[in-house]
Amino acid sequence: MPTGTVARAWVLVLALWGAVAGGQNITARIGEPLMLSCKGAPKKPTQKLEWKLNTGRTEAWKVLSPQGDPWDSVARILPNGSLLLPAIGIVDEGTFRCRATNRLGKEVKSNYRVRVYQIPGKPEIVNPASELTANVPNKVGTCVSEGSYPAGTLSWHLDGKPLIPDGKGTVVKEETRRHPETGLFTLRSELTVTPAQGGTTPTYSCSFSLGLPRRRPLNTAPIQPRVREPLPPEGIQLLVEPEGGTVAPGGTVTLTCAISAQPPPQIHWIKDGTPLPLAPSPVLLLPEVGHEDEGIYSCVATHPSHGPQESPPVNIRVTETGDEGQAAGSVDGSGLGTLALALGILGGLGIAALLIGAILWRKRQPRLEERKAPESQEDEEERAELNQSEEAEMPENGAGGP
């Protein structure tokens, strides 16, 4: 065994002996050598001693003797009776016992409870916030520590003082994971706060503590996000597709609640005055719409600093294809229908008048022919008389000539 390794082991033993003298608890850093002394062991061979250990490497008590065995690479007994662990690990945590018989035949026992530790790297705040909004919850950042054993704890500080989570204005979400191969821990702590209006610029930091005596916490670099006043929300609008809210059975209706506010408010939906049991979302999708989906819909935007705000309602109706066309142009359709009805009535009256006129004309036609026949005969008689008078005058005119 190299001299340097033995020297470091003895230094560790001397450093820990003060803690062991009063009690039998020892803490050792992972990967470092550890030496445990056996009280009462004879300084000269042959000594009578026995080491027993119950650790993560054993299912029960393991007995070691000075003669050595295959466990020499893990733990072996030195000539002076001490037990050396060249590189202690997590699996070496447990109980170690030594029983020795001195020259006077008196039996002396030594008991040790060994714990190991590993100091992680310096913690850091990932995804730190550069700006916070007053009166609303804000995520400050996530404090991360990697490679610790045991797990340890993460703590947040505000302006140098411990920040105690209260579940309201200060919320901390913690997560602890253990590496399946090394057994070391990774800790994550997410801080969410609700800063007040008009306050000073806060300073946040995070620290890691292993929970061992004489071990100082490891601190992150501080962050100073500025606090701004929340923007009041603008008017809320409810958009519906298809436009007008009228859809055929089996169609799809999409309702979108539009509001401009920072941070974005939570959107809840109401139908016929009753809140719908849905998760907050700015979009409400109604697929395969049926008559049971008909009703008055509206959305409510809840902003932490400004209270709830409800949108104008929208009426969703389910109609057949023909009814849908009629409903889509209800004003124009009714006017055109009235005009068509009036034209139809007038056209019918005109046709009826023509038919009556034709019938009456046909009835009067024979009478007119009867009246015309006598008039023609009288004309012929008058014409004959005129011809005769003209013929009588012609001879008279001839007889009176020179």
Swiss-Prot record:
Residues 23-109 form the Ig-like V-type domain. Pfam families: C2-set_2 (PF08205), Ig_2 (PF13895). Residues 1-22 form the signal peptide. Its main location: membrane. Disulfide bonds join 38-98, 143-206. One of its GO terms (biological process) is response to fructose. The chain crosses the membrane at residues 342-362. Endothelial cells and cardiomyocytes. Expressed in brain. Phosphorylated on its cytoplasmic domain by PKCzeta/PRKCZ upon ligand binding. Phosphorylated by ATM following DNA damage. The keyword Transit peptide does not apply. Residues 376-394 have a biased composition (Acidic residues). Residues 23-341 are extracellular. CDD domains: Ig. Residues 368-402 are annotated as: Disordered. Keywords: Cell membrane, Cell projection, Disulfide bond, DNA damage, DNA repair, DNA replication, DNA-binding, Endosome, Glycoprotein, Immunoglobulin domain, Inflammatory response, Membrane, Nucleus, Phagocytosis, Phosphoprotein, Receptor, Repeat, RNA-binding, Signal, Transmembrane, Transmembrane helix, Ubl conjugation. It is a single-pass type I membrane protein. The modification Phosphoserine is found at residues 376, 389. Residues 123-219, 233-315 form the Ig-like C2-type domain. Residues 363-402 are cytoplasmic. Constitutive homodimer; disulfide-linked. Forms homooligomers. Interacts with S100A1 and APP. Interacts with S100B, S100A12 and S100A14. Interacts with TIRAP. Interacts with HMGB1. Interacts with LGP2; this interaction plays an important role in AGER-mediated pro-inflammatory responses and cytokine release. Interacts with double-strand break repair protein MRE11 which is a core component of the MRN complex; the interaction enhances MRE11 endonuclease activity and promotes DNA repair. PANTHER family: ADVANCED GLYCOSYLATION END PRODUCT-SPECIFIC RECEPTOR, CELL SURFACE GLYCOPROTEIN MUC18-RELATED. This is Advanced glycosylation end product-specific receptor. It comes from Rattus norvegicus.
